[in-house]
């Protein structure tokens, strides 16, 4: 079964998903895929007291952290170094994405697809699919899209994607 977690920007989708992942891990459920927590700093002028600076990707199950995207307006020089190849100019995204990070995360999904299924059925997690993957195709986490499109597998009868 495919579960889709959706909601407005910065409403806590990934925080909720992290809580679910923690509970499933406590129960021994195999989890594979990627979680995309925000990179935050304290900012008392913001309604929630924090300001989002970027997005990391945490590979499941290993926990490797990959710096994935950073806000363009905060560090234009750093952001320009993270420009995703093939990004259409008209997309005007607030985030600069790292080619290396996208390649690393896509390679992770390729390895999951080619690897052996866990001994116990688990959950495939994709946090998150957005405009790059859904509006333009061929950009972003394309290998995650391919894997989810294959449908249930013995190792992951269920998948949860964040959109």
Regions found by a protein language model. Name each.
Residues 9:
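The conserved Walker
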Residues 16, 20:
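Hydrophobic positions on the alpha1 helix immediately C-terminal to the Walker A/P-loop
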Residues 75-136, 142:
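Phosphate-binding/switch loop-helix module in NTP-utilizing enzymes
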